[in-house]
């Protein structure tokens, strides 16, 4: 998809695991997006079928799901200001989607992902990273790249030079190590490990019953 665009100098981005999104929840997400002034919102576990894009009031939604099953699913929702800066999109599959924005001094590509869980078969994990690598290779080298949301990985508090800082939680697991290696191979830094925050702000996942919390989400950015 190609579109006329107007560059933006700054924008606010966010990400949300909606655990499925019907029409009622879509309206709630739109209202929350407007309330906190988010220009670009990545969404995971959308659980819609098919792929496409459409306008909904002041927001524009790009989405990817499976052809017939309501599982996984990702989307990127942009407000009017963000929509005016869109250069194109890549509706890859039910686990990843990208939208490219005109920016100053560099254009920006945002990729929303929903990685396989720790219980997934190794073949599924490898396919995910192969697909993501292909998506990165389609991204112009000069773009500032952001990859956001559900990695289902724990990178832990151990620092890795040029990839992570020291502000993270827990112990690195196998999924976290795989993510670290992917970042090293592609010159990416995990930005949310670089800044000190209160511990309650580090948790990115809460179980449906509210009993368990974890930090499994990461925001990756190209090293500059």
Question: What label would you give each PLM region?
Answer:
Residues 1-224:
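A shared catalytic/ligand-binding motif for oxyanion handling
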């Amino acid at each position: 998809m190609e579109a006329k665009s107007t560059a933006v100098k700054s924008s606010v981005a966010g990400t949300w695991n909606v655990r499925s999104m019907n029409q009622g929840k879509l309206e709630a997400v739109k209202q929350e997006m407007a309330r906190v002034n988010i220009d670009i919102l990545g969404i995971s576990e959308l659980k819609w079928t098919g792929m496409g894009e459409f306008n909904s009031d002041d927001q524009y939604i790009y989405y990817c799901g499976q052809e017939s099953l309501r599982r996984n699913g990702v989307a990127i929702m942009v407000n009017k200001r963000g929509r005016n800066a869109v250069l194109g999109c890549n509706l890859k599959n039910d686990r990843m989607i990208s939208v490219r924005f005109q920016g100053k001094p560099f254009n920006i590509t945002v990729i929303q992902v929903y990685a396989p869980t720790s219980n997934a078969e190794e073949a599924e994990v490898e396919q995910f990273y192969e697909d993501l690598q292909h998506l990165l290779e389609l991204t112009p080298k000069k773009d500032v790249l952001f990859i956001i949301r559900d990695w289902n990985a724990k990178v832990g508090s151990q620092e890795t030079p040029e990839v992570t800082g020291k502000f993270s939680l827990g112990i690195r697991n196998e999924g976290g190590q795989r993510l670290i290696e992917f970042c090293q191979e592609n010159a990416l830094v995990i930005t949310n490990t670089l800044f000190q925050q209160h511990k309650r702000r580090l948790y990115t996942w809460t179980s449906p019953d509210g009993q368990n919390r974890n930090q499994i989400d990461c925001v990756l950015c190209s090293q500059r």
